[in-house]
Amino acid sequence: MNAKHAPFRHYLDLADARLGSQVVAVSDEWFAPASRMLQAGEPVWKEGVFDDSGKWMDGWETRRKRFEGHDQAVIRLGVPGVLKGVDIDTRFFTGNHPPAASLDGCFCTEGDPDDSTSWSEVLPAVGLQGDSHHYHPIDDERPWTHLRLNIYPDGGIARLRLYGVPYRDWSSLPPGTALDLAAAVNGGRALACSDQHFGRMGNLLNPGRAINMGDGWETGRRRTPGHDWVIVALGHPGSIEAAVVDTLHFKGNYPESCSIQAAFVEGGNEARIEAQSLFWRELLPAQKLEMHQEHRFERHLNALGPITHVRLNIFPDGGVSRLRLFGSPQLP
């Protein structure tokens, strides 16, 4: 399966270190640490660069196994989630990649797994090629807190992407609790946008403030009439009480203004939602923006009641680092 036919790539990467995901156990990392697999950036090749262990590689690499068994790494997800698909990426590993790999999962209510933990198969053993992406859909609705990557018998993996939906027990929230319903860690997801030439739309929902301009959503320079936009599905229906539009790091390329539309959508696919968004009600009327600044809007918001989706419009183009939508989830 290639990237074009892997629609699950639009979901959140639950293994992203920026979410707090980390390697908590590893059988071997002689040549390169397993933590590199979880980096958000694309792997790179550094010609002629060596360290004390050998050739520097941007990923996890174990030593050559001279006895029975295989290598494995256990990842604690920053937020529990249901997997929709995975990418086992071996870019730049040629001649030192594993010929096969598999994934197991577990759900720990407290702490990390131990010898008594029961693991379930998430992805059976699949063949791997060197210097390649390996996309595999996952049809399993069980949530996981930890994933175990098994490589057979040894070798190197550049990146492990675990695409899915964060799991949260919304019924356990006290009534009236307000939180960022658009946050990726709460299940928020960017569905569609007019353009993402310089920065991916999903970056808008990342935790914390942006680390640089590349950690936001940025469109190309608009040379035709109109404006740019992005549609976000909230992690849970709710009533919005405050909106934050952050232009941190965007100075000569921030939008002149923005507005937000919203709706309560039941059913329909992404194409239908995109078409309908033109006619959604106005949550936030057009507001002026400043460069490199966090803009918080409360009194400007219209009271629309519970919503499920928003459309952020930016005029005419530019970059926004974060979108936050604080409100109370609509609970049963």
Swiss-Prot record:
GO molecular function, one term: allantoicase activity
GO biological process per UniProt: allantoin catabolic process; purine nucleobase metabolic process
Keywords linked to the UniProt accession: Hydrolase, Purine metabolism
InterPro entries per record: Allantoicase, Allantoicase_dom, Galactose-bd-like_sf
Pfam families: Allantoicase
Superkingdom of the organism of origin: Bacteria
Pathway the protein takes part in: Nitrogen metabolism; (S)-allantoin degradation; (S)-ureidoglycolate from allantoate (aminidohydrolase route): step 1/1
E.C. code: 3.5.3.4
Catalysed reaction, written as an equation: allantoate + H2O = (S)-ureidoglycolate + urea
PANTHER family: ALLANTOICASE (PTHR12045), INACTIVE ALLANTOICASE-RELATED (PTHR12045:SF3)
Sequence similarity: Belongs to the allantoicase family.
The protein, known as: Probable allantoicase
UniProt source species: Pseudomonas aeruginosa (strain UCBPP-PA14)
